[in-house]
Amino acid sequence: MNPSIFIILLTTLILGTMMVITSSHWLLAWIGFEMNMMAFIPIMMKNPSPRATEASTKYLLTQATASALLMMAVIINLMYSGQWTITKLFNPTASTLMTVALAIKLGLAPFHFWVPEVTQGIPLTTGLILLTWQKLAPLSILYQISPSINLYLMLTMSLLSILVGGWGGLNQTQLRKIMAYSSIAHMGWMTTILPYNPTLTLLNLLIYITMTFTMFMLFIQNSTTTTLSLSQTWNKTPIITTLTMLTLLSMGGLPPLSGFMPKWMIIQELTKNDILIMPTFMAITALLNLYFYMRLTYSTALTLFPSTNNMKMKWQFSPTKRAPLLPTAIVISTMLLPLTPMLSILL
């Protein structure tokens, strides 16, 4: 792809998201979603291949369906209230449709089927944009309409997402699919707490984006996309491999790493609201995520997959890819837990 065209597409992608985040008018938000989608599809096709074509087609169909549902919800709300303002969502039908549309855009269960398939068909850098930046616009709308969303529908989808995110990643060997299922589970955690404490959702989103950015940057540094290639990185880049394992455990929510903090604070907030069964279910289901991350860490750290001797010592040049933000991202991804008391005061 021509670098100038790529920069224009990237600028349009950023502008579309910013338009959704900053607008208080439904039409402007919808236009922002469309700008974002139309700019992202050519970025997915940057390296043309049948898999990229399939992934971008799936992405287009799901996002177009979600946009149509969103516009239908806006029109129903307009008919009943005469309001274009995002925060004034009064009609229950419009609220339910809006929740479903945004759930499709976020990839919440049971509308999650496109996320692993699309993530697997695109390069690591594009996958990073899909699982981080592309979550900002739908979550910002959910944040604004959180007082009027259908609570039971939202909580059902959130719990399903946590369950699917744990189960789906259990038998995966492709790292991009594992990250996709992890994203589904994290979105479940964020949307569970949204009706009770939206600020906590933003904190969870910030930590999730940092951890996902760190993981993808580490994968890009080593050019690893499968568990087999990850298990063979210890003799090429031992420090990066160690940091990869730490970040994986943090994503699984293992204390005393940063990933444990949002889970702890969400469970604490739910128990403060006298909700006991749901956080218990969430904590037990989170063990599924932790299990496949620990299995991945174990296979990377202690064992080698069956391979011939000449595969064990992979020859290559020293890594020359620059990643200036990586050290900071690793520190935030693994060492944020001691700041929990300060952050809980702010929340």
Swiss-Prot record:
InterPro entries: Complex_I_Subunit_2, NADH_DH_su2_C, NADH_UbQ_OxRdtase_chain2, ND/Mrp_TM. It catalyses: a ubiquinone + NADH + 5 H(+)(in) = a ubiquinol + NAD(+) + 4 H(+)(out). It is a multi-pass membrane protein. Its EC number is 7.1.1.2. Its main location: mitochondrion. It comes from the Eukaryota. Pfam families: NADH_dehy_S2_C, Proton_antipo_M. It is found in: Mitochondrion inner membrane. The chain crosses the membrane at residues 1-21, 25-45, 59-79, 96-116, 122-142, 149-169, 200-220, 239-259, 274-294, 325-345. GO terms for molecular function: NADH dehydrogenase (ubiquinone) activity. Core subunit of the mitochondrial membrane respiratory chain NADH dehydrogenase (Complex I) which catalyzes electron transfer from NADH through the respiratory chain, using ubiquinone as an electron acceptor. Essential for the catalytic activity and assembly of complex I. Belongs to the complex I subunit 2 family. This is NADH-ubiquinone oxidoreductase chain 2. It comes from Balaenoptera musculus (Blue whale). The gene is MT-ND2.
